[in-house]
């Protein structure tokens, strides 16, 4: 692989992964295969284990048992720099603020492709500039990262992952802090890149619109997996989320659309009005 080559989409295998903390399973025997170029959404209520599972993929947390394989190689056996050339992560939390400009943060995405102590070359600068433009933060290039709003920081971190040119992406609530336009832009970008992606999302309608398949997590386990129209059913939403909802086909897109019935409890007793 050349220094500036873009990694091809890889196959990601989560093989019987469990994570135990103080004897309690946060992730419980999860297996999931994401084919090259496929976008799989992780959905489920808070505390279901989505973020914990993703941390095992981008190697922030070692599984108690099981393996995570990228193109057949255990990610824990890959040199860090090699893994970073092939896998990029966008996290929902910002681990402290960087004492760097926006440009410098995005340029960090080029680090896996450089020799030690090497500076940016023309290709690096072009890639960083393109990523800044793609995420609509080019006008912030010289601004201190730590002075940005939450949404601006999120877009910068997505731009950093884009500059990494990895073939596989892990995104934990990438639309967190983003307004509606930038939520759509971010997920459209993931689709357009053609990368292999696992995306944790809370918005079920966004998940149905942009993901090839959904894995529904509950209490650390995957309880349903498949195409959005097969997975998102009123019965599943009642069981997993404890809400009553209608799931209909959107008349323009043909995709499943979830409408929460905020005026009903799970027994169907009228309490108020319905809301999309």
Named regions from a protein language model:
Residues 66-74, 83:
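Conserved ABC transporter NBD signature motif
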Residues 107, 122-140:
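Conserved ABC ATPase "signature" region
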Residues 43-45:
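The feature captures the beta-strand-to-loop junction immediately N-terminal to the Walker
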Residues 234, 238-276:
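ABC ATPase nucleotide-binding domains
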Residues 169-173, 178:
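Catalytic Walker B motif of ABC-type/P-loop ATPase nucleotide-binding domains
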